Amino acid sequence: MEHGEKHITIVDDQGNEQLCEVLFTFENDTFNKSYVLYYPIDAQDDDEIEIHASSFEPNENGEDGELMPIETDEEWEMIEETLNTFLAEEDEE
């Protein structure tokens, strides 16, 4: 995972792979982390899309980094606020 990627493959607990589209990535200085918001590509246009979030650390050579779970309520609140701002800006366009 690195900034600017458009698709990522998520592997669930059972080892199933799911291709997802990256909505956007951002960095947060408060938590000193990078975050990615994404959703499954196979979601239908008329279905409500479930957006997922993870933190990630790009590796040193700029290739795929490791996704990590969001750990605190404070992080979730910050992510929700960032997502709401993003969606509001998209609606204005």
UniProtKB/Swiss-Prot annotation:
Q: Which domain of life is it from?
A: Bacteria
Against InterPro entries, the record matches this protein to: UPF0473
Where in the chain are disulfide-linked cysteines found? none
Q: Which residues form a coiled coil?
A: none
- PANTHER family from the UniProt entry: UPF0473 PROTEIN CBO2561/CLC_2432 (PTHR40066), UPF0473 PROTEIN CBO2561_CLC_2432 (PTHR40066:SF1)
> What family does this belong to?
Belongs to the UPF0473 family.
Q: Report what the protein is called.
A: UPF0473 protein RBAM_024480
Species the sequence originates in:
Bacillus velezensis (strain DSM 23117 / BGSC 10A6 / LMG 26770 / FZB42)
